[in-house]
């Protein structure tokens, strides 16, 4: 291994149509809204201004992350780099909550149950029925996933377990070549990765929020441990304000 630190950039997709409507999204494939597109472009500008230019990008199979990567890379003039996509970087599957309004869910089930489903490490929501309009059971992009691995609901622990094989088999090999790696993904798949990188406990991960569209830069040592624990946001003031807004999701009317 090289002695120089490895460079990893995490980027949560820009605001989506359902983020703006305060709906649980999960595996439902919604697009970015206009604000989200601008966030993605700004994310690329931040990368370029910082001189932190990715050599390869990894993203999910969901269009909001794919589109964010495209817009950010175009803005940073890195549209030509290799792109790898995996369902293992998808957002957490929210089960029967997918498509539901967060504020209405909070009012219906109460804050304790709402927060248990939304933020506990190992308590998933009820599973999504196959016949639901928000089911991905017939989606061709997931046809190659063995049925036993295709989720109908997930907690964050499930996301960690399905994401980590891709970290070791897909992302780490690119880091080992000395490439600067961009991972454009989702709030919970990135929380799962940050939990692993920073060694965050099952209890403390509940308090971690990742804002949309603001690159989070990590420098990793040769054991892939952060030299800058918690990472460094390229726009820390905007990140702090956005993190506070994420905390308040569910309270919006």
Swiss-Prot record:
It is an enzyme of class 5 (isomerase). It comes from the Bacteria. Pathway: Carbohydrate degradation; glycolysis; pyruvate from D-glyceraldehyde 3-phosphate: step 3/5. Keywords: Gluconeogenesis, Glycolysis, Isomerase. GO terms for biological process: gluconeogenesis; glycolytic process. One of its GO terms (molecular function) is phosphoglycerate mutase activity. Gene3D superfamilies: Phosphoglycerate mutase-like. The active site is at residues 13, 91. Substrate binds at residues 12-19, 25-26, 64, 91-94, 102, 118-119, 187-188. The record marks 186 as: Transition state stabilizer. Pfam families: His_Phos_1. It catalyses: (2R)-2-phosphoglycerate = (2R)-3-phosphoglycerate. CDD domains: HP_PGM_like. Its EC number is 5.4.2.11. Belongs to the phosphoglycerate mutase family. BPG-dependent PGAM subfamily. Catalyzes the interconversion of 2-phosphoglycerate and 3-phosphoglycerate. This is 2,3-bisphosphoglycerate-dependent phosphoglycerate mutase. The gene is gpmA.
